[in-house]
Amino acid sequence: MTLEEFSAAEQKTERMDTVGDALEEVLSKARSQRTITVGVYEAAKLLNVDPDNVVLCLLAADEDDDRDVALQIHFTLIRAFCCENDINILRVSNPGRLAELLLLENDAGPAESGGAAQTPDLHCVLVTNPHSSQWKDPALSQLICFCRESRYMDQWVPVINLPER
């Protein structure tokens, strides 16, 4: 590996960390503003009803999920819909970290019916535009720019690794 190749690889790693941090910030803000939709079926319903307000689609799956044919079909349909409607898509390679971010302080106790709380489907997460104002968030702008640059390089669904904390 030459010095130039090493430098390019290091810059790419730093950029991915920066994009991962930006994604964490966007998810945190969207969660506090209640502009997140979680779940494959819930996402499909929202995309069908109001695709113009969706600014980001996250698809999260681990190696075990790669063998789930039904989930892969849903992912393919969601990706196609997002590409057709100019919705930015990211694939999250560590769904465990995504779950930590989205379920943090989220009714951590058991369900009120006395049974165990059912964990939500985090395979698909949509971030929508708040109706009160347009996002002027630099972290969201950075993610949108990253998605656009990835599309220019024919990488339609870039893979992001959320940094561990």
From Swiss-Prot:
Q: Which SUPFAM superfamilies match?
A: L30e-like (SSF55315)
Which locations, inside or outside the cell, does it occupy? Nucleus
Superkingdom of the organism of origin: Eukaryota
Q: Which GO terms describe its biological process?
A: cellular response to ionizing radiation; cellular response to mechanical stimulus; centrosome cycle; negative regulation of angiogenesis; negative regulation of blood vessel endothelial cell migration; negative regulation of peptidyl-serine phosphorylation of STAT protein; negative regulation of transcription by RNA polymerase II; positive regulation of apoptotic process
Pfam families listed in its UniProt record: Ribosomal_L7Ae
Which region is the signal sequence? none
A Gene Ontology CC term for this entry? Answer: nuclear speck
What does this protein do, in the record's words? Might affect PCNA interaction with some CDK (cell division protein kinase) complexes; stimulates DNA excision repair in vitro and inhibits entry of cells into S phase. In T-cells, functions as a regulator of p38 MAPKs by inhibiting p88 phosphorylation and activity.
Q: How does it assemble?
A: Interacts with AURKA, GADD45GIP1 and PCNA. Interacts with MAPK14.
Entry's PANTHER family?
Answer: GROWTH ARREST AND DNA DAMAGE-INDUCIBLE PROTEIN GADD45 (PTHR10411), GROWTH ARREST AND DNA DAMAGE-INDUCIBLE PROTEIN GADD45 ALPHA (PTHR10411:SF3)
* Name by which UniProt lists this protein: Growth arrest and DNA damage-inducible protein GADD45 alpha
